[in-house]
């Protein structure tokens, strides 16, 4: 039987290592450029803590196919944790955009392992506008490759198989994909 774990980012004390990825700054600096999310102690769901990021902290990641923005990214190593098995995981999330100009973009959950990223395109996530949703967006991780898109790999012989990435996930987050102009807000 698989061990069940509950990971809860409640943002009571801080941003729990959530960041944005700025691809263009990374190209200029020659190293990955992440900006820590801003933490607010109040104002979240039921006046809880929450985090926020905006377009000053992200840029389109042009090696991704399709081109993606990675506004919320979390590496487990940032909190001294190893990979996590997300097989059949249940995800519950509140996502909010204040004056967010999506320009056709959809929001997706993604996973990364061994220089390979897969976006869970079967479930576009709802971004409530200018207020918190009444209930969280709930979804389950499925291993069916038809429900995913391999957006990037740095491996010379092709991407890491989806099942391996889900089982050994070292990073996960939320992406914006399908925009005509870079998302702002």
Describe the predicted segments one by one.
Residues 28-33, 149-160:
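Surface-exposed intrinsically disordered loops and tails
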